[in-house]
Design a protein with these regions (language model features):
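Basic, short loop/linker segments at the boundary and entry of helix-turn-helix/winged-helix-like folds
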Residues: 1-30, 35-36, 332-338
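Short amphipathic alpha-helical interface patches used for protein-protein assembly/oligomerization
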Residues: 53-57
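Anion-binding and metal-coordination hotspots
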Residues: 36-49, 59-349
Length: 349
């Protein structure tokens, strides 16, 4: 009955022809989703001949199934702008929480891509501003604090944001161009879903397919924060310095997976260079200290070696390919939060 309350203001009690039952209009897409029916037109055709579907919708054998265009018009005119599906989801979630079926202390999140119903050949190229990264304002403040601490001048604010060229679907402009593997490219959506350890879905968000999981995280977490989670378990797509810092600062434990160190085969790996917090330097395998030089706008401190020492180093060929024999190691100013995540990964089984 709560659905009638949610849609009450979209119906007139004393004008017009008798309307379709709003509960039935909500149930129809559920049939389409549960049974993987490709289109609303085919869903309505199946409802006409399937007695189980009719019973679920409250239709007798003599009742006429609604026309597929009738469903589309009702949805777009009455429900689309109201966020009806979101309201129904929230209401049912509240019932589950009150019944004690959900344990929000440990929340698992993951993202997947859903192919859009859009022709890959129908698009325009346009220039758009690059999306600001999560916690970019806080990062900018701490970058300048770090530079001042090291005797460097603060960076000037960026006057003009970077732009990039991207494909915009003329069929479905809200979708995004997604690179699926090495060769497949499609217009798609990125769906982020959170669930508890029993598998109950707690929240979701949908973004354009070209939005990275880490950029979609803030919208999803905003829905999870009222549940007061103690642990957030996620895959490597969410393993970034900003997300690690954000969760730890909120006293939420991030449980993130092992990620293979990047680097060229046969070359020294980042783990071979040890950061010395006390002296703020990086020690190489041959015990040379790489000293601090600058902090970049992206939030990375640069530590550089002495080329004169490196020129005679026995590990030079597997250490760096730079022409001046200088090794450069970068370390994010929030790297310590990722290191805490590594400690957590080894603690919890």
């Amino acid at each position: 009955d709560f659905i009638y309350d949610l849609v009450e203001d979209t119906y007139s009690p004393d004008n017009g022809r008798p309307s379709l039952d709003p509960v039935m209009l909500v149930k129809i897409p559920l049939i389409q989703c549960f049974y993987g029916i490709r289109s609303m037109r085919q869903t309505i055709k199946d409802i006409e001949v399937n007695t189980a579907y009719r019973w679920f919708l409250g239709l007798t054998l003599d009742d006429k199934a609604p026309h597929f265009t009738t469903y589309g018009k009702n949805y777009s005119r009455r429900f689309q702008e109201k966020g009806l599906i979101e309201s129904i989801f929230t209401h049912i979630l509240g019932l589950c929480i009150n019944a004690g079926l959900i344990d929000p202390t440990e929340i698992f999140i993951d993202g997947t891509h859903i192919k859009a119903a859009a022709n890959n050949r129908k698009f325009i190229n346009q220039e758009v501003e690059k999306q600001a990264k999560f916690m970019s304002e806080q990062l900018e403040i701490e970058i300048n604090q770090d530079r001042v601490k090291h005797g460097k001048k603060p960076l000037k604010p960026v006057e003009k944001r970077e732009v990039k060229n991207q494909k915009l679907s003329t069929t479905d402009p809200e979708s995004g161009w997604f690179h699926k593997g090495d060769h497949k490219e499609v217009f798609a959506y990125s769906a982020q879903v959170a669930c508890d350890k029993y598998g109950w879905a707690l929240a979701y968000s949908v973004e354009a397919g070209n939005i990275h999981d880490s950029q979609a995280f803030p919208a999803l977490f905003a829905k999870l924060e009222p549940l007061k989670p103690e642990y957030i378990i996620a895959d490597s797509g969410y393993k970034t310095p900003s997300i690690a810092k954000f969760l730890i600062d909120k006293e939420i434990t991030p449980v993130l997976p092992y990620t293979r160190p990047r680097g060229k085969k046969g070359q020294l790996r980042p783990k071979d260079f040890v950061y010395d917090e006390h002296f703020d330097c990086v020690l190489c395998p041959e015990h040379q200290a790489l000293t601090y030089r600058t902090t970049t706008r992206e939030g990375y401190r640069e530590y550089k070696s002495d080329p004169a020492i490196c020129a005679n180093c026995p590990l030079l060929s597997v250490c760096t390919t730079s022409k001046n024999h200088q090794k450069v190691v970068t370390r994010h100013i929030w790297k310590e939060y990722l290191e805490q995540c590594e400690d957590i990964r080894h603690q919890r089984g």
